[in-house]
A protein has these predicted regions:
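A cross-domain feature marking catalytic cores of carbohydrate-active enzymes
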Residues: 13-15, 37-41, 69-71, 144, ...
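Alpha-helix capping and helix-loop boundary segments enriched in small/acidic/polar residues
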Residues: 14-17, 44-45, 86
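Generic structural signal for helix capping and beta-alpha/helix-loop junctions
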Residues: 19, 45, 75-77
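Short hydrophobic alpha-helical runs that function as membrane-insertion/retention elements
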Residues: 34-36, 159-162
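Structural motif corresponding to the early beta-alpha repeats
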Residues: 35-49, 53
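Internal, glycine-rich beta/alpha segment that forms the wall or movable "lid"
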Residues: 51-159, 166-169
Length: 169
């Protein structure tokens, strides 16, 4: 219905709901609309899990899915999600590189060998490799509030999602 009203994009955030189910519904009920998580909180989810979801949604939609990732604040990571806290910008860089390494393995068949400070992915067998896609992997957008995340977005992502409360000051 949104597409018939002239909308060309849909964004699903993660507040009081999980963001991927609304994305699936948006992709299922549209033909051309771009649909993005805006944003999915990264650190409580394994890069492998997010890579799988991104691959499946991109394949299902013939290339209309965009992956928006964010870090959330320390209190939510530690007390809501029970995830250890570390400086978010370097960890997000590693997270995105891990997702991209997984996608590269699925696209090329190269051995998975990602080893970082926070994430290690070294096992991928044919049984767990998704079918090939006819489109490219989803673009990845990073949410950010300050220069550290903006730098990460420029270095390893496809774009930056600004916080709704951002201002020039």
């Amino acid at each position: 219905h949104a597409e018939s009203l002239g909308y060309d994009a849909l964004v699903s955030g993660e507040l009081n709901n999980e963001p991927f189910l609304p994305v699936l519904l948006g992709l299922e009920h549209s033909k051309k609309m771009i649909v993005r998580t805006g944003l999915a909180i990264a650190f409580p989810r394994s890069p492998m899990t997010v890579a799988n979801m991104g691959w499946d949604l991109q394949s299902f939609s013939d290339g209309r899915f965009q992956l928006g990732l964010g870090t959330q604040v320390k209190g939510h990571n530690e007390r809501r999600f029970s995830v250890p806290w570390s400086p978010p910008a370097p960890r997000m860089r590693e997270y995105i590189l891990a997702v991209k390494a997984i996608w590269n393995t699925w696209k090329t068949g190269e051995k998975l060998d990602f080893q970082g400070e926070h994430y290690t992915h070294t096992l991928m067998t044919p049984m767990f490799t998704p079918p090939p896609m006819d489109c490219d992997v989803p673009p990845i957008y990073v949410s950010g509030l300050g220069p550290g995340m903006a730098k990460i977005a420029g270095e390893v992502a496809d774009g930056l999602l600004l916080h709704p409360m951002c201002s020039p000051k």
